[in-house]
């Protein structure tokens, strides 16, 4: 069963984007479900507002999918999103990890898939322009100056140094040479 989803938007733009998404869903004969979410960033100051918002929306997606007897959720993360997350985890968490193309969520008896994981953001922008899709308006108070926007800029800088940098970063996730990495010191 197919379900078309959207992420949270500010009130000013919400109606415009909602109607645009509704018309896209109708055009493709997909059900259109609206579910409002909210969060309070002061409830957990250890986590960034971006993480809390994302987790709140993701949890709602799991609940809605479960209610509609779905066992997979397809998310629109593209290659840039995955590489930016890798860079964020390396620089902010000291961890080598990112969003995998497939992730089994046993707690929710659900699988997340990311079918656009190999597509670059710039390619999606070109296809959207060619197909005449309207860009979704965002009104996130935390977006500018976020770690993700810093990582987007870092990825651009790495590509300026080496045009193949994104492909090297992508390949590094499956080419881990453990013999050449430090071991945990006891």
What is each stretch, according to the model?
Residues 2-13:
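Single conserved hydrophobic/aromatic residue that forms the stacking wall/gate
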Residues 14-16, 45-46, 85-87, 179-182:
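Short, well-ordered secondary-structure micro-motifs
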Residues 15-22, 121, 125:
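Short, surface-exposed alpha-helical segments at coil->helix boundaries
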Residues 19-44, 144:
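A conserved beta-strand->alpha-helix junction
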Residues 24-26, 65, 128:
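A generic structural signal for well-ordered alpha-helical segments
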Residues 43-45, 51-123, 169:
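Active-site adenylate/phosphate-handling loop in enzymes that bind or generate adenylated species
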Residues 97-186:
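ATP/NTP-dependent adenylation/nucleotidyl-transfer catalytic domains that generate, transfer
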């Amino acid at each position: 069963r197919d379900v078309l989803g959207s992420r949270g938007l500010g009130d000013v733009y919400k109606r415009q984007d909602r109607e645009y998404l509704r018309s896209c869903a109708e055009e493709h004969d997909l059900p259109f479900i609206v579910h409002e979410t909210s969060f309070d960033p002061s409830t957990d100051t250890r986590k960034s507002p971006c993480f809390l918002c994302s987790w709140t929306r993701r949890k709602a997606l799991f609940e809605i999918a479960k209610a509609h007897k779905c066992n997979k959720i397809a998310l629109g993360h593209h290659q840039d999103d995955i590489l930016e997350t890798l860079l964020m985890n390396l620089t902010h968490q000291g961890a080598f990890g990112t969003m995998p193309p497939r992730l089994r969520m046993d707690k929710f008896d659900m699988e997340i898939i990311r079918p656009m994981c190999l597509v670059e953001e710039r390619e999606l922008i070109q296809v959207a322009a060619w197909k005449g899709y309207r860009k979704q308006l965002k009104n996130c108070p935390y977006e500018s100056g976020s770690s993700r926007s810093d990582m987007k800029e870092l990825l651009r800088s790495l590509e300026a140094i080496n045009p193949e940098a994104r492909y090297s970063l992508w390949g590094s996730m499956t080419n881990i040479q453990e013999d050449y990495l430090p071991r945990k010191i006891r």
